[in-house]
Each structure stands twice: as structure tokens, then as C-alpha cells.
Amino acid sequence: MKYELDKTSGNARRGRLVFERPQGTFSVETPAFMPVGTYGTVKGMTPEEVRATGAEILLGNTFHLWLRPGQEIMRKHGDLHDFMQWHRPILTDSGGFQVFSLGKLRKITEEGVKFQNPINGERIFLSPEKSMEIQYDLGSDIVMIFDECTPYPATFDYAKKSMEMSLRWAKRSHDRFDELGNKNALFGIIQGGVFEELRKVSLEGLVNIGFDGYAVGGLAVGEPKEDMHRILEYICPQIPADKPRYLMGVGKPEDLVEGVRRGIDMFDCVMPTRNARNGHLFVTDGIVKIRNAKYRDDTSPLDPECDCYTCKNYTKAYLYHLDKCGEILGARLNTIHNLRYYQRLMAEIRQAIEDDRFDDFVVEFYARMGKPVPPLQLADNS
């Protein structure tokens, strides 16, 4: 993988990731949003439908794909690309966040994490080395190191110990990645909770090891939005400018805008797909809750400014009807729209950076939403 930085507008960065795959050279224009395909599928969508929304890269889930279908079946198909028939780039998370989510079902040690398989109750073990081996079998174009996702709230001492162990795991991940002869990209993950000095130590340690990109982890786990913004403003300027920056698990449309304002290049989140299945649809001026009875006889398109298949062909009344009847097509049409909304938003962001009018775009974006523009502070990184 190669990262090319073309232009900046304030802190916002316009570039691309370039991948050499067996099928040819693929570019991912950044800032980019990655739809989440937890089990090797973006829920309800074929790969062709996902691509039609504008997506150029997907996220797969190492933890869940390891439990089902497992490495052996993946190897029989070739890799995850062959298994799910998506031959463009794939990023896989390491499984660290899913293990964190297990709560009392898991025990963290220096060696790794012992936990109870949520599917069959078996006791199993996941380590940095094992995560690298699973992601190697998945054929991930971007591999994430195995880390501990520091919970919120956490004391300074807990966050420090967690971050230090994640650094040791980062080195073990890097060593095993190299031993496997993996020619793809490996990203480090910056931890440290809401404590700036810990984030700085984490980043410095990761840079000393050397990675192809750097993710900001451990945010969007319950901390106030102001803390997320503060950490991003503090740490992003310190990340090497020639490496991509990835904010993990974020988020709402305004979170994407705020991340780009602070220098982030890559995002992923289940929000557009999960919200679609729950009837929450993103439109130019906010959200349409399609289950609201006021849409029962609304013959207008969901979003007149949207060019997706759903908006070009169907009315709000039809989407309301499908949802009311529990029809699978309703969830699919909603998902097509929400994914396209996110990709259109990213395309608008990229164009605004190219035109060096990103600050104006931010003002216009919040004006459409009827919301004030959040403050942007200049962090003191001395």
C-alpha cells in the first residue's frame, strides 16, 4: 500500500491509498468511509450494490470471521476477497475491540486474552500473534495490530498500563506480521484513553516500531464528544504526515466532518447500515425516521438531492409501507440510501478540500442541519 497526499485545506487532507492486488491497481480516495462487513457481508447487500454506492474499501471483522466460518474454510476459498467476492481492498480490525466488548467473559493477560466463545461457550485464546495469522489467512490489504481497547471511564493508572501493554503487543504484532512474510499494510493503533500525555507516549512508541499507517483507537467508547475532539486535535498533528490516519468506529455524519477538520483520513462505522435497518435514514438536512406515520401517504422521494437507486425510484410512502410490513426489501433500500449518503458526503468533503474551501463546506453542512459549528481549538503540542 502507498499513501499519496495531494492537498490540504486547514487541517483537512486530500489524498489516496494505492493498492496493488492480483486483479490490478486499486485506489481509495481519501478522506474515505469504509462500510462494515462484519461477517464477510455488508448486511443485505451484494458486493456490486455496495460498490454502486461509491465504496472503494470495506472493513471485515477478524474476531467474528475467526469464530465463523474459521481459518480453514477461508483458506479453502483463497482468502476473504474470494469468499465474499469483493476484489477491492479490505481492512480488517484485529479483534481487540470485540474482546473488549465481551466484558466479564474475558481475561486479559500479558500473553493475550482468554475468553468464552459467545457462540458455543468454549474457552479460547487470542494473542497478537494469532491475530496476525488470522488476518494473513483473510488476505487483508490493511492489517490492524492487536491491542487492548481502553474502556471509558478509566483511571490514569489503568489507561497507562493498558497503553503500555498495547505497545508491547504492537511490537509482537509487527514481528509476527514480518515472520509471515505478509506484503500488505500494517497499521498501529494509538491508545491512552482521554489522557493527552499517554496518547503522545503511545504514538512515539508506535512510530519507533514503524507502521504503514496509524489509527486512533479507544474513542467513541462513551466519552464526551469534547474529549474525542480534544484528543484528535492534540494527536493528529503529531502523526507522521506521510502516513494515513484512521479514526476507528466513528461515526455519525457530523463525526466524519469533525474528524476531517482535525486531519483524519479514514473512518468506519456500522451506523449507516444499522440505522437503515431501524428506519433512520440520513438526508441532506438531517434524519428521516421513516416509521413515523406522517410518511404513510408522502409521495416525495426520500432525498431529492440524492442520486441513489432508492431515491431515484421510490417514495417515502413506499419505504414506510415496506417497513410497516417487515419486508426485507425495505431494509435493503434503506441501506442502499444510507451507504450512498455517506459516500456522497465523503465526495463532497474531498471536493471541498481540493477547492481549498473546506471551512466554507463545514459552515454549509451545519447550516443544512440547523446546528451550530463546533469550536475548533488549536492544541499545544509542545
UniProtKB/Swiss-Prot annotation:
GO BP, one annotated term: tRNA-guanine transglycosylation
**InterPro entries per record:** ArchSynthase1/Queuine_TRR, TGT, TGT-like_sf, tRNA_ribo_trans-like
Q: Which cofactor does it need?
A: Zn(2+)
| Residues where Zn(2+) binds | 306, 308, 311, 337
Give me the ranges of the annotated region RNA binding. Answer: 249-255, 273-277
The positions flagged as active site in the entry are 93 (proton acceptor), 268 (nucleophile)
| Known catalytic reactions | 7-aminomethyl-7-carbaguanine + guanosine(34) in tRNA = 7-aminomethyl-7-carbaguanosine(34) in tRNA + guanine
> Which EC number(s) does the record attach to this protein?
2.4.2.29
Task: Give the gene name.
Answer: tgt
Under the heading NCBIfam families, the entry gives:
Q_tRNA_tgt, tgt_general
The protein's superkingdom reads Bacteria
Give the protein's biological function: Catalyzes the base-exchange of a guanine (G) residue with the queuine precursor 7-aminomethyl-7-deazaguanine (PreQ1) at position 34 (anticodon wobble position) in tRNAs with GU(N) anticodons (tRNA-Asp, -Asn, -His and -Tyr). Catalysis occurs through a double-displacement mechanism. The nucleophile active site attacks the C1' of nucleotide 34 to detach the guanine base from the RNA, forming a covalent enzyme-RNA intermediate. The proton acceptor active site deprotonates the incoming PreQ1, allowing a nucleophilic attack on the C1' of the ribose to form the product.
EC main class here is: transferase
* Family note: Belongs to the queuine tRNA-ribosyltransferase family.
Q: How would you summarize the oligomeric state and partners of this protein? A: Homodimer. Within each dimer, one monomer is responsible for RNA recognition and catalysis, while the other monomer binds to the replacement base PreQ1.
Q: Which UniProt keywords apply?
A: Glycosyltransferase, Metal-binding, Queuosine biosynthesis, Transferase, tRNA processing, Zinc
What is the protein name given in its UniProt record? Answer: Queuine tRNA-ribosyltransferase
UniProt GO molecular function? metal ion binding; tRNA-guanosine(34) queuine transglycosylase activity
> Which pathway features in its UniProt record?
tRNA modification; tRNA-queuosine biosynthesis
Source organism of the structure: Haemophilus influenzae (strain 86-028NP)
Q: Which Pfam families match?
A: TGT
Residues bound to substrate: 93-97, 147, 191, 218
One GO cellular component, as annotated: cytosol
Cofactor-binding details, from the entry: Binds 1 zinc ion per subunit.
